[in-house]
């Protein structure tokens, strides 16, 4: 009975906190689905122009030719 009461009170607190904070949060936490995520980011394929390694799909930018290798 005590376990059920604790679970019920916890659920009530979570529901209240979610309802109260809805619409008030200015800066939400970043999630793995953001565009800045390496798994979902757009990248330049081999032969395309680049200025840094993180622009290329294979993470290598030739500084001599400014192209992804």
Curated annotation (Swiss-Prot):
Its main location: secreted. Residues 1-17 form the signal peptide. Residues 18-41 form a propeptide. InterPro entries: Conotoxin. GO terms for molecular function: ion channel inhibitor activity; toxin activity. The keyword Signal applies. It is found in: Secreted. It holds the Pfam family Conotoxin. Disulfide bonds join 43-57, 50-61, 56-68. Expressed by the venom duct. One of its GO terms (cellular component) is extracellular region. Belongs to the conotoxin O1 superfamily. The presence of a 'disulfide through disulfide knot' structurally defines this protein as a knottin. The cysteine framework is VI/VII (C-C-CC-C-C). This precursor corresponds to allele E1c. Has not been merged with other alleles since they may differ due to geographic variation (see strains in PubMed:19606224). This is Conotoxin Eb6.22. The gene is E1.
């Amino acid at each position: 009975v005590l376990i059920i009461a604790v679970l019920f009170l916890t659920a009530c607190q979570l529901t209240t906190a979610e309802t109260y904070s809805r619409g008030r949060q200015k800066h939400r936490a970043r999630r793995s689905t953001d565009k800045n995520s390496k798994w979902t980011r757009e990248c330049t394929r081999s032969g395309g122009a680049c200025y840094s390694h993180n622009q290329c799909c294979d993470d290598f930018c030739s500084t001599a030719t400014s192209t992804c290798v």
